[in-house]
């Protein structure tokens, strides 16, 4: 398989995984550690305000985009690789009465379909580590930011080398295998032309989420056994193993979660 084909497989698997009934059973409509409370903290950290033009890269089903529009009265454009997610996000915005403040479209983080400098802020939650070409994604996010615009990321981090048994495709879509250190993320963003960094440790949010997923996996297994939930091609035993390993890695300080902000200067 060529590198381009492998990258495309990762993107398709990520989109399919995060549109699945299984993911909604495990996470609801908010897929990232910390939930909407951490989304609000991210909005504060990049100083969102009324009228700001915000891009949410890998917006999923739109929970964060809608929340930011409601709380900060900003105009949010959500972009996701999954067509079903885009439709669900628009429906969610309609239901919450913020359709006038939100727009959703399908697209690729490594080739953003927007002109240069059209956003005051760009965010991406628990997604940057899944992008196969992080340098290109960072350059694209910097490109669409206006001068003085702010970038905000929350994402998985890994300090040290991950064990071989967690370097799997499922680990990629579960935001583990492609993660780096906070400093590595910052360096990638710096090379894209961003600066003025802040970094916050948010590992407690990851620990809480993983423990919640482990509890819910028991219910998922029961529902699947009763024919009430389609697991598709997902190996549930592998999912449970990854969850156990994630807890071990968090406790050892190998895996974590971070909030990073930067500015286009």
What are the language-model segments listed below?
Residues 1-23:
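N-terminal, positively charged/glycine-rich alpha-helical extensions of SAM-dependent methyltransferases
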Residues 22, 156-176:
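Short, glycine-/aromatic-enriched active-site segment of Class I SAM-dependent methyltransferases
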Residues 32-50:
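Conserved alpha-helix/loop element of class I SAM-dependent methyltransferases that forms part
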Residues 55-57, 61-111:
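Class I SAM-dependent methyltransferase SAM/SAH-binding core
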Residues 110-121:
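A short acidic, Gly/Pro-enriched loop at the edge of an enzyme's catalytic core
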Residues 135-150:
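A short glycine-rich, Lys/Arg-flanked "PGG" loop and its adjoining helix->strand segment in the class I
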Residues 178-193:
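Short alpha-helix
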Residues 200-265:
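Conserved Class I S-adenosyl-L-methionine
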């Amino acid at each position: 398989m060529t590198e381009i084909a492998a990258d495309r497989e990762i993107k398709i698997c990520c989109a399919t995984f995060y549109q699945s009934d299984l993911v909604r059973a495990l996470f609801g409509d908010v897929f990232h550690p910390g939930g909407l409370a951490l989304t609000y903290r991210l909005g504060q950290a990049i100083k969102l305000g009324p009228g700001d033009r915000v891009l949410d890269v890998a917006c999923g089903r739109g929970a964060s985009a809608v929340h930011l529009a409601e709380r900060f009265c900003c105009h949010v454009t959500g972009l996701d690789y999954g067509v079903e997610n885009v439709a669900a996000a628009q429906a969610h915005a309609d239901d919450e009465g913020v359709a006038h403040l939100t727009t959703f479209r399908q697209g690729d983080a490594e080739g953003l379909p927007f002109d240069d400098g059209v956003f005051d802020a760009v965010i991406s939650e628990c997604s940057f580590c899944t992008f196969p070409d992080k340098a290109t994604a960072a350059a694209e996010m910097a490109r669409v930011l206006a001068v003085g615009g702010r970038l905000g990321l929350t994402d998985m981090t890994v300090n040290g080398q991950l064990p071989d048994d967690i370097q799997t495709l499922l680990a990629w879509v579960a935001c583990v295998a492609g993660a780096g250190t906070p400093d590595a993320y910052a360096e990638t963003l710096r090379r894209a032309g961003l600066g003025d960094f802040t970094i916050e440790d948010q590992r407690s949010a990851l620990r809480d989420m993983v423990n919640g997923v482990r509890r819910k996996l028991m219910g998922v297994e029961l529902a699947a056994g009763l024919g009430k939930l389609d697991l598709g091609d997902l190996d549930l035993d592998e999912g449970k193993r990854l969850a156990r390993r994630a807890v071990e890695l968090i406790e050892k300080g190998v895996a974590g979660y971070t909030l990073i902000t930067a500015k286009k200067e």
